[in-house]
């Protein structure tokens, strides 16, 4: 198990490093499914689905759904087994109007997404990841990018400048005033522009000019007028008359050229967006190989460029960003892929096994079901969006699958999609995976003594009688039994531990209850322990990754078998 656990953890870290945002996580999970034989679908096309086949669907590059239709999927004995997670994480996202200039420094205005431990983002090497929209000829192009090198930083205030006693932690961070990452100085921004325009800039290097603008966010327009030249943020104070005249002529020629080539673009060309930081646009234009003025909008997350890694003297831990919940979602999809591969192997080998009287690794009724794995966006901010868990996208996906797979039954027996769904839902189940809180050795008072979570002790089964978690004793027992059946077959234990928050502590919530309510389907909330949740650098244990992946696999493989043995004692 040690070797396999490390392999799983290594794969998870590689995935997380490549997934600096929700967009890239969706893209990378989609590629992972396609590499395992899943067929790509689009919402805007007619679905002609086949049994014993896997499919993958992305909605707006924010929500990913993989599913596999069992070869004997049927109305009478089949079920819908769903494992879910969320692919967003707390992050600093660049604002639409992000141009900030203070003390001869270009900064970026950002917005706090979710409830992050924002003080941990200070003094880190920050890159960018996300979605950019730009013009290319007559087309509007969406591009997903990730810049893994350090292009931004958020400096702390030096200890000597803080009005504090030696026992204070630090200055209190104001999220509006203090979280504005630095991208460049105004000097180097001007030098770069002059270099690109083949203009001599010796005067800039020898001039020590005080800027006359008011460094106040309420006077940003005045700021831009003092700092920008022809709406391109070139300082008039630092350029001589010839340089100004040269730049004016060059920009007018460029504008006239664009207008002449495309008369319809006149209004667009004449409007140069000064609300966006020019150094940021320059960076993005290099990445996209386009012009700055062609960039229309973006959704970009700041990300830590330091790679995740194994840690601890025995390398029993892993550390990195976005474990909540990319680590959980990786385990969801990995367990799902392993299940599908085992079904395919079972199908291809069952005739040979029957002839040679070989016992199959999995039970035959595993072919009777529809298996689904989903990664939602926007969990960190409440899930209320078209790609979040509160939407009806999951129910829409299931309805479309039923309509395609049971097309013949619907026509010949005059059945409705809702009738078929109503028959299936009674045997169906949701397994929601989201990270959990490990007992912190430095803050032992934060957890209930009877419900502590420990590293290497396995999956956390989350309970909350106020339904912040969807778990009930009945359904927790069903899942625990699947773990036992997995052990009976493979002789590998899937450890688990029960979790509940203190009565005097607010209980976090996740998407399990939301999806269960939308689908009228029972479920359970699970996860694995981690420390420093919502920090830019989080900690988890290697062996728990193994337990979670195998737990998802066991759920898919044995849930129906366990459910069939469940009886009510009269």
UniProtKB/Swiss-Prot annotation:
Report the GO molecular function annotations. Answer: metalloaminopeptidase activity; zinc ion binding
Q: Which GO terms describe its biological process?
A: peptide catabolic process; proteolysis
Q: What class of enzyme is it?
A: hydrolase
User: According to its UniProt record, where is this protein located?
Assistant: Cytoplasm
Q: What cofactor requirement does the entry state?
A: Zn(2+)
The keyword Hydrolase is assigned to this record: yes
Q: What does the record note about the cofactor?
A: Binds 2 Zn(2+) ions per subunit.
EC numbers on record = 3.4.11.21
Q: Where does Zn(2+) 2 bind?
A: 324, 380, 534
- What does the subunit section of this Swiss-Prot or TrEMBL entry state? Homododecamer composed of homodimers and homotrimers that assemble into a tetrahedron shape to create a central tunnel containing the active sites. Homooctamer.
Described by its record, this protein's role is as follows: Aminopeptidase which specifically catalyzes the removal of glutamic acid or aspartic acid residues from the N-terminus of peptides. May play a role in the final step of host hemoglobin catabolism, by cleaving hemoglobin-derived oligopeptides in the cytoplasm.
Task: Please give the name of this protein.
Answer: Aspartyl aminopeptidase
Tell me what organism the protein belongs to: Plasmodium falciparum (isolate 3D7)
Q: What is the lineage of its organism?
A: Eukaryota, Sar, Alveolata, Apicomplexa, Aconoidasida
